From Swiss-Prot:
It comes from the Bacteria. Keywords: Chaperone, Cytoplasm, Nickel insertion. Belongs to the UreD family. The keyword Cytoplasm applies. This is Urease accessory protein UreD. Its main location: cytoplasm. It is found in: Cytoplasm. Required for maturation of urease via the functional incorporation of the urease nickel metallocenter. HAMAP family: UreD. GO terms for molecular function: nickel cation binding.
Amino acid sequence: MMIAAAGTRPQRAEGRGHLAAKLLDGRTRLRELYQEGAAKIRLPDTFDASMEAVIINTAGGLTGGDRMDWSVEAGAGTRIDVTTQACEKIYKASAGTAEVRTSIKVGTQARVDWLPQETILFDRSALFRRLDVDLDESAEFLAVEAILLGRKAMGETVMTGLFRDRWRIRRSGRLIHAEELRLSEGVAALAARQAVLGGQVAFATLLYAGPLAEAYLGKVRPLVEGAMGGASAWDGKLVVRLAAADGFSLRKILIRVISALRNGAPVPKVWNL
């Protein structure tokens, strides 16, 4: 007699990482660190009053059904730069959607720079990403999210897939910025439209929320001249949108813009070209 084998759920990558910082003797110091599953956080040495955190997905990428949760709390007066060890790769999904959720709280006179490296979407991948940020009235926040539709140098094309990116940025409980991006099914055809990406396969959004938004605008606009994109500032926030033919071209522009929004400070070392 033959017995049918019971269906088994493929093993999925899951992880949760939490970082909290406090101000001690004029420097940003670790208050809490928690890491679980595929989520790891490393804290390289810094030579100023700030803290740098490098978040790592030890699974090496994400596919349908994987889930990562990150949270960051910057206490009063602290400064934290958060980046990733490498580009996050989103692979073909046989079933389900990968999920990445990030929660950031920035306290009084504190600043967080959320600077992950690019996310690479492969053909038939599926990702839902969510960023929730709560800012104190006096806090500053800088975020960049860059997307590559495959790797152009490898001849990769993303014909179809699913990508949802949702941002909710609040200051003192009041919503000040929202993003709701969705790419689905005919991704290549959608990206080819002039009103979307005009055939470009690398794109990014940068957001700065803080008292220097309007002042930064004059520094940023000359840096994006000649590129596909633009910059605007209003109501205490600055938004930059960019698109490029490939990831290398995009990164060259991003490094200049990010540095300008950090008062000339360089990007984290893992970002170097």
